[in-house]
Amino acid sequence: MKKLFPSIAKSNLFRQMAMAFSLLTFSRLVWFVANVFWLPPIGINEYVYAHLVGIYFDIPVVIGLFLPVWIWVIFGHSWRDKFPAINRILFVISSMTVLISNGIDTGYSQVTAKRSGYELFDILGDDANRFAPYIIDNWYIILGLAAMGYFIYRWVPIRGHYPDINFRMRPLRGLIATLTFAAICLIGFRGGFQLRPLRSIDASNFVQPEIAPLVTSTPLQIISTWKRNGLPNFEFDVQFPANSTITSDPKNSTSQKWLFDNSTTLLPLPMSRTLGGGWVQPNIVFIVVESLARDYTGFGNGKPFTPYLDKIAADPQTIQFPYCFANGTKSIEMVPSIFCGMPSLMSEFYVTSAYANNKVNNAFHLAKGYKTAFFHGSNNGTMGFQSFLKQTGLQQYHGIDQYPSELYKRDFDGNWGIFDEPYLQHFIRCMDTMNDGKQPVFASVFTLSSHHPYTIPEPYLNKLRGKPGTVQHTIAYADIALQKFFQTAATKPWFNNTVFVITGDHTSHSDKEYFYSQSGHYEVPFLIYAPGIDIKHINEKRNRSEELRNQQLRIQQPQTFANPPRNEWADIINTATQKTLSQCDIIPTLWNLLGANNPRLGFGRSAFDPNYEGYSTHIDKDLYYIIQYPFVLALNQQGKVVDYHKQLRNNNKSQKLPLEGPQFEWLRATLQCQMKEYSLRIKQNRWE
């Protein structure tokens, strides 16, 4: 092997690799100097650490973009010495690809405040005229790139030792070396052995999200987002109804609020009144059950596979919103919808798209004063949740890596992760640890047992409703897991100070035709359960002894509603629960109920907002849908209506409706506005 691979330190392979890494490090330094004004202040230790981590993130770039160089250097035994210029040219081309992409983005990041990915080509393609002023304004970058190109061409190491792989002389050794080279390239290009290939968004796992762009590079961002479908440019004009209250004008870049509203800043939720008459700042726990469709519940008028959940829904301390719709059909679409207020209006998944690094607000980040955590009993890298949530401000992510190793073998389902019952008990133990009396907790747990292939622990086989191996059977198991979760949690001191939100990430199979319709196929439960909080009268008489209580609690109690008497408060709840909501509305509704004044999150609004009529949107087969039960309207990418119908839950047949009337005009204008605004804001990374 000494003859095959000479001293690495003396080989040109090592020198060229070192030069490639040096170029990326240098371009990172230049990018930092040019963009330091919008980055948060960091100390020298953080800066050095970011560069060291950046070298790790440069590995896929060095392997991928310089692959022709390495193939020539390692396998070009017969031609390498005869044609040294080929090595030089290949290295210069690869190097300039890196430098040009980083160089262009050095100036462009000053505008977007982020690293650009493949969408940069879409932007330049949409309007090539933008590029000329950019070159003029950033002439020094162009000049620097030209100088770097000349330097690389002159100084790239060509003469010297190279690995000597000769298939004719030693075919077996050559085969082994080839397979080794391929394995190293594959592992390096993926960035290691983790579940998903290394992407720019993963930088937030190493440094604070605000300086993650310093760690990564534009070439890596382009590689991460290569061949993404992106977002279309909607050229149609919004057809506003007469006397419209919709304030959206996507053509006007200075439009103020539109349908989207990110005006909610860091939010200290006020104290809530307990059933015992005291006041607490409650814990918030989200329980998102995999594939939990409303169809599977008793309150959904279906076969009751969820007797315990039905019991919670009927509890006096529960508010049920019966017209809630998921914004997507995949688990990966749930996180941005619920926790960022971002519906699924892309043909690809937002979490893994070119725009995942956009600076959208996140409920975990906005909940000021809370410890925040997200729990999912699957691999830490699954669906990109950990990287996405960490870069939007989540404090703790708990996946299978954080599950007790001594329990793993017993509780692993053989497919996705930890069975629901033991994982929810693990979640309780973590809640015990987090509830140290210093800060309330805002945590979410996402179950997984009711995911295909629908496995449950052996003791429960043939003992639950539903056919084994079906989603209904595993939903029945998830209901048992919820029952045991609440039985254990009820013994904990933090239980009565906690508000629970229960919903599903999306729906699944059904034996009813309605639940395959464009409305029924998206219906998920939405329950707010507060066992120890006076949830239905939480704002009643909030001003009583307000000044004294504020002195005691040292917290301002913003008034959400006009402190109505009980009969009026019941009317408010009844009005809110009759509205059509989407997953985007869950957080604002919860916060509004807990006392926050007019909270907004992305495209989500509160059901208690008297000015919000309520609706849900999603995309299916390149058609865009808006639901305001029982009405459903669909548009194509040209903004043309392709379907408008009405369908009730107790009727499997939909009723086609004429394309006219105030309801039709409002739905069409609202969906057209959201399509245009969603696309424009994501492309421009505009979230003000």
Q: Where would I find each of the regions flagged by the language model?
A:
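Intrinsic-disorder-associated interaction segments
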Residues: 6, 248, 252, 546, ...
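Phosphate/adenylate-binding glycine loop and adjacent helical scaffold
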Residues: 598-688
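Exposed alpha-helical structural elements
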Residues: 47, 119, 130, 218-221, ...
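Soluble catalytic regions of membrane-associated enzymes that act on cell-envelope
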Residues: 194-554, 561-602, 610-616, 620-622
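Transmembrane and membrane-interface helices of multi-pass
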Residues: 2-235
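Bacterial/eukaryotic Sec-type N-terminal signal peptides
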Residues: 1-7, 543, 547, 557
